[in-house]
Amino acid sequence: MYMSKNEYSNIKERSLKIMNLLKTLKALSHLNRIRIVNLLSHKELCVCELENIMGLNQSNVSRHLGKLQEADLILREKKAQWVYYKINEKPFNKHKFLQNILNEELEDHVVYEGDVIKLQKYLTSEVSCEELTDSNLFGNIKMN
């Protein structure tokens, strides 16, 4: 039995949707990537801000950002010498359960809560991204 071109096209389209959803879920299957999404859901940030808040090195943060970007979960924007990352709202609006997980399930988790507390302390510290990179000022901010 043969499929019509239209039937084949519909199956192919549905398969692509499933593959894209799986790619999204795979990108969110690592603690640090969920931490990044959690932080970016509060504010657009650059790599140096993420690495200092999360306590990770630049290569780890960049690797995780790359995977999130490949899955189209985040967007990047270059501003002068800095690259800033922010949430891509489209997949979160398309798959509401992703936003529900972030909003409801993770808000009381100690790691994510700690990241948000660190972000808030950083934002109120008046330390700029340039100062984070050029000095150890971030180390002077009590984070715990």
Model-identified regions with their sequence ranges:
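C-terminal regulatory/oligomerization modules of transcriptional regulators
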Residues: 1-16, 90-144
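N-terminal helix-turn-helix DNA-binding core of bacterial DNA-binding proteins
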Residues: 19-60, 83-92
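Alpha-helical residues within the helix-turn-helix
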Residues: 52, 69-70
